Structure formats: structure tokens, C-alpha cells
Amino acid sequence: MAKPVSETAVPLIRPEAAVARPKRAIPWEFWLLLPAVIYIFLLIGFPLILSIYYSLSHISVGRRDFSFAGLANFRAILHDGIFLQALRNTVLITIAVLVIVLILATILATILAARFRGRAVVRYLLLLPWAAPVVMSTIAWKWIFDSQYSVINWVLRQLHIIGPYEFPQWLGVPKLAIISIIMVQVWRILPFATVITLAGVNAVPKELLEAALVDGAGFFTRLFQITLPMIRPIIGVAVLFTALFTFTDMAVVWILTRGGPYNSSHVLASWAFQVGIVAGDLAQGAAIALFMLPVLAAVAVWVLRLASREVTE
């Protein structure tokens, strides 16, 4: 006997049930990245937001005035002669260090890429300035620049470049103080730039250089027409980090000269520390520090885009 139609009919499926899909769980990559994101935010993001907030207020150490000041702090520092001097010093020191470091790093990388006895020892000695703490090495340089017991003065006196009773004040004359800061920055950053450039030089195919050598290409032809064009993206990375390290460094200037004599050797980082922490004007100190942000961001974007274009081509 056949069943009634009502008992054999196929049950209706609701449209919501037909389109419903199982909920997608949070990907495991998210949980792996979360600690790093939180760490970076607490270390960089939160101080940056706090600096922006301070720079737009009237806050200082002795007065908790969080009232909105607009761009008054930025307008005030643009009319400050010491700030403009610090800005000129920062740009001058960064460009000088960049040029000297790139030239010396290319020469050292070319030498260290060749095989010779004692190459490992030379590479080890080259890395020592980078491994040493910046504060301790800068204190040692301060002794080297001492007006009476300076090793540099002794060498210059032995070479008869200066007289027996001349004592150049390396840290007491504005121009000599800037030269001293440049020397220490070059000594500090050169190992890092050399290692990066050396990695690029070693990555150049040996067959290409040997073919050029067979064709009669000399050393400088191979260097300027093969090696340097091929490692241009890596040189871009060295340029970026050298500029960032020099532009944002405060320790070398503060230990050597503390911005002296007469505030003539300040850079933006040391002047921001002087105004914001030593003098207690947190608002203007934050404004000076934030002045570096757009410059560094523009340099970083330009270098990274240049390097990316070179790799793509």
C-alpha cells in the first residue's frame, strides 16, 4: 500500500540554511604576529602618539597644561636660531658621513672580497667598532680629542703639521667640533656599511667578471660598469641605514660636546633632548623631535622605491 503524499515529500530547506557556511576560525598566523605587533606598538607607536599629543599642547615638567596649542610650538622653533643651526648641522653631518662612508665601504669591500692571507683577522678587526657600545667608544674618542694629551695632536706635531706649542681644541672650536663628530660617526657606521656592501660584491657572478677580464676590461672598468651597477640596490640599503643612524643619533654629540661650544654643534636629536628633558619644555622638545619624522619618512620611501625599481629591472 502506497504511503500518503504528505509522508513521502522532501522536507523544505530554508534559504538561510542553504547559504550558511561554517565560521572561519582566526588564522594561526594572526596569533603568531600579535605579540610582535603589540611590542612594536608599545615601543614605537605609543611614544609617537604621545609625542604628537605633547607637541600640540602647552605641557611642561612644571605645569601639566594639556590645553590645545595648535601649531604654536612648531612656529616657535622655526624662529629659534639654535634650532636652525641644529638643522643645518644635522644635514651637513649626515651628508658628509654618507659620502665618506660609501666611498670607504666600497674600497674596503673590494679589498676584502679578494683572497689574501689574514683576511679573516682583518674582517674581525673591522667589525670591532660596530660591536663596541657607542657610549664607551665615544668616551674613548673624547680622550683622543683631549686638548693636551690628544694622540691626534701628537701625530700632527711629529709630522710637523702643527708647531710644538700648538694645541688644537678639537671640541672647543665650532668647526673642529663638527669635524670631530663626523670622524666618530664615520668610525662607528663604516663596519656596518662595509659588511652590507661586501655581501653585494660577493653576490656578483664570478663568470661575468672573468669574461670581462678576458675581454681586456681593467679593474676600474669592471668596478664601475659591472660591480657597482649590479649592487646598486644593496648600496641603497646601506645609504638608508647610514642616513637613519646619523640623522637620529644623539649619543655621540651629547658625550663629545653636549652641543657646545655655545650651542654651535647641536643636532636635532641633541637639541630636542636639551629642550624637552634638560630644560623641561616637553611640548617644544616633542615638536623638535617630530620635525625629523617627515624628513626620515621621505628618505626611506625614496630609497626603498629606488631599490625596488632596480630589483624589478
Residue spans for each PLM region:
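Short, Lys/Arg-rich, polar N-terminal cytosolic tail immediately upstream
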Residues: M1-A25
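A structural signal for multi-pass alpha-helical bundles of membrane permease subunits
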Residues: A25-E313
